[in-house]
Curated annotation (Swiss-Prot):
The keyword Methyltransferase does not apply. The gene is rplM. This is Large ribosomal subunit protein uL13. Gene3D superfamilies: Ribosomal protein L13. The keyword DNA-binding does not apply. NCBIfam families: rplM_bact. It comes from Geobacter sulfurreducens (strain ATCC 51573 / DSM 12127 / PCA).
């Protein structure tokens, strides 16, 4: 009888990947990033263990959205006070905080459980081309 080997947290080796978001479509890029954060392309992938790698995204301010999503797509949050629902379009969010647009897209593609918070901590997003993770020697990932 064959048994399935379950990955343990201590056995996982984590790599660093660098993604350039310049002229990339948000959704297509976010799905690839979510798969890397989960570790789905590794042979030791286990759904109940965080086997994913670190991802550094640069040039978040230069990403693309298809169609009229810059003007039509709305992002909502609530302040907690009565009548405190706030909304912002995707175009204004790119101007104000381009990192949040990628982070929200990837967060929606991760599992809705406790592991998602640990996976999201491995995502580092920067609006410009510079990042402070050169010491980790990230591999360039072409998406």
């Amino acid at each position: 009888m064959k048994t399935t080997k379950v990955a343990k947290k201590e056995e996982v080796t984590r790599d660093w990947y660098l993604v350039d978001a310049d002229n990339k479509v948000l959704g297509r890029m976010a799905t690839e990033i979510a798969n890397i954060l989960r570790g789905k392309k590794k042979p030791i992938y286990t759904p109940s263990v965080d086997t994913g790698d670190f991802v550094v995204v640069v040039n978040a301010a230069k990403l693309q959205l298809t169609g009229n999503k810059l003007a039509d797509k709305m992002y909502y949050h609530h302040t907690g006070f009565p009548g405190g629902i706030k909304s912002i379009t995707a175009g204004k969010l790119i101007e104000k905080k381009p990192e949040d647009l990628i982070r929200k897209a990837v967060k929606g593609m991760l599992p809705k459980n406790k592991l998602a918070r640990h996976m999201l901590k491995k995502l580092k997003v920067y609006a410009g081309p510079e990042h402070p993770h050169e010491a980790q020697q990230p591999k360039t990932l072409d998406i």
